């Protein structure tokens, strides 16, 4: 039975999702329907958690807008997501960054992960 469910879920899984982790800054482009029009709205912020697996996987992005913290949770494999871009990679030691909710300004900064340079030929 679970093989049938897994097979059906595999059809709906997206393959164009980049690898990202909590601490990374991402820009999520979401398809928004307004009346009979559809437009793309960008939401940029820090990934504070990623949970679930398979088709049920979600991630939460946090940003501060006009001094107010805004968190938005997206299903990873949703057809409403136009694209996900990784802006910066962050260095964190936790899988859930709930402690960022209490921090503001410089205290909420996350160090950038430096990637190994490709060797010059």
Curated annotation (Swiss-Prot):
Described purpose of this protein according to its UniProt entry: This protein is located at the 30S-50S ribosomal subunit interface and may play a role in the structure and function of the aminoacyl-tRNA binding site.
Keywords per UniProt: Ribonucleoprotein, Ribosomal protein
Alphabetical list of HAMAP family matching this protein: Ribosomal_bL19
Similarity remark: Belongs to the bacterial ribosomal protein bL19 family.
Protein name in the entry: Large ribosomal subunit protein bL19
Cellular component terms (Gene Ontology): cytosolic large ribosomal subunit
Keyword Membrane: no
NCBIfam families tied to this protein: rplS_bact (TIGR01024)
UniProt xrefs under InterPro entries: Ribosomal_bL19 (IPR001857), Ribosomal_bL19_CS (IPR018257), Ribosomal_bL19_sf (IPR038657), Translation_prot_SH3-like_sf (IPR008991)
Organism: Symbiobacterium thermophilum (strain DSM 24528 / JCM 14929 / IAM 14863 / T)
Gene Ontology molecular functions: structural constituent of ribosome
GO biological process: translation
